[in-house]
Amino acid sequence: MKKTYGLLLCLGALITGCATNTVSIPDNHYSDAYRGVPSPASILLLPISPDKDEYRHGVSAVTHLLVEDLQTRHTVETVSVPVFNASWQQAIEDVGGIYSATSGAFDRERYFRAVEELLQELNPEGDHDIVIFPALVERQAQSTGKYATWDGVRRANITDGLDNARFSRWHGSVGAVSLQLNSFDGQGRWLATSYGGLVLPHFYTIKDKIPRTHLKDDMFADENALEEGVRLAVVPLLGPVVKNK
């Protein structure tokens, strides 16, 4: 299952590149033809793919909020993880894999063909106008010590045993978690990739003058933070879009 989830994250890198966004607005990208989703629309929501194992704890809560937000204007149907995994693996096999047999490089064309194959299985009659591939992805936030900003949000860095002078150690880029939505039309043509910042997964300590970074056990516990991030990622699907220049 981990391999299946990892394959799904390739599209975001294809569209936005490998560099991560460090500004305070979501780094959204749209196809030239995308003008937003007419309301109401029928949306097929695929399972959330966590970028890392530690993000799996947030899948249930974020899924609930995502469905709730989308249902304010659209009809939403979900797909179970077992059904999705089986269909996606079959789609990959049908196109001969999505990596080059000679170089091992990711094959963008085959990836998009696999998406089209997948939707022929999951959306054969074209009943759904939009199909969403959601993921919990690692991003880079711009930290100024006490706070970090990325993908439309500002979050406080959690620290223990630090005075103001020592915050300078965490100026610059720090890891963050965002919700990424890759949206396609019913035939598998890419429409948009949108983001919303969720949480900072780490907290920081200094003991015996040694700085340490720790993974939060409860990184997805702040429901207000999750709600804000989900709402930001969903905005391009709830009305007309303002495209980044």
Residue ranges and their predicted role:
Residues 52-141, 184-190:
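N-terminal segment of the mature soluble domain
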Residues 19-40, 126, 138-245:
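C-terminal/domain-edge helix-coil "capping" segments
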Residues 38-53, 94-99, 213-214:
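Acidic/histidine-rich, surface-exposed loop or edge segments in extracytoplasmic proteins
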Residues 1-8:
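Bacterial N-terminal signal peptides that target proteins for export
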Residues 15-17:
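C-terminal motif of bacterial Sec signal peptides marking the signal peptidase cleavage site
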Residues 42-47, 131-135, 180-182:
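Soluble periplasmic/extracytoplasmic beta-strand elements of cell-envelope proteins
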